[in-house]
């Protein structure tokens, strides 16, 4: 067996002119879909070379409105936060869209993507790219844990049309979402939050 060396290590750095904030990796057959800033990269599993890319920039009007509200320009970009193959030819993508969350269904074709449908992404995708969120797609349904307002004060677990009680700290007390998964008939959400018994001590408690 040949010993592997540095030449056998493949790297993908994305756009080197700014931070991409990669958060998502979705395997699609022999490819990896990687979500970042304004882009979804389609990479070969063999050597991580880019085979194709999906570009989605926020409109000038959405960016302008984001800046008017005092948000730094770095955050008024379109950060991809949800990637799901809903069937063999359709990709669901949700992104922060300059603090105006949006979701799109894309048709997947050799060499390109086409927009099939667009809708608001509130309660599915965070406004702020710095907020942690999670999602899982089960039996044709998207389950999400995120925040549903501009200020990040309304945490939510959501599956259309159901959601957790708004502003109910007994259910969600400023959670920091970590992950989610389906097991049998249940969907589990994992997050950290300030434990009530340690409210004055700054202690965090893991919940699920």
Write out the residue ranges for each language-model feature.
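Disulfide-stabilized extracellular ectodomains of secreted/luminal proteins, especially beta-rich
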Residues: 1-208
């Amino acid at each position: 067996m040949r010993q592997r060396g540095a030449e056998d290590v493949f790297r993908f750095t994305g756009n080197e002119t700014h931070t991409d904030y990669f958060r998502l990796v979705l395997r699609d057959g022999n490819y990896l879909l990687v979500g970042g800033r304004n882009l979804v990269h389609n990479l070969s599993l063999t050597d991580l070379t880019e085979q194709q890319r999906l570009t989605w920039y926020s409109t000038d009007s959405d960016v302008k409105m984001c800046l008017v509200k005092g948000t730094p320009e770095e955050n008024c970009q379109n950060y991809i936060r949800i990637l799901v193959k809903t069937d063999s030819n359709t990709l669901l993508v949700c992104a922060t869209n300059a603090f105006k969350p949006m979701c799109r269904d894309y048709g997947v074709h050799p060499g390109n993507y086409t927009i099939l449908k667009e809708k608001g992404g509130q309660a599915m995708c965070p406004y702020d790219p710095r907020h942690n969120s999670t999602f899982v797609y089960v039996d044709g349904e998207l389950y999400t844990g995120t925040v549903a307002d501009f200020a990040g004060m309304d945490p939510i677990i959501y599956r259309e049309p159901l959601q957790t009680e708004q502003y109910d700290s007994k259910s969600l007390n400023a959670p920091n979402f970590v992950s989610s998964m389906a097991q049998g008939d249940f969907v589990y959400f994992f997050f950290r939050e300030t434990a009530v018994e340690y409210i004055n001590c700054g202690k965090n408690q893991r919940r699920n």
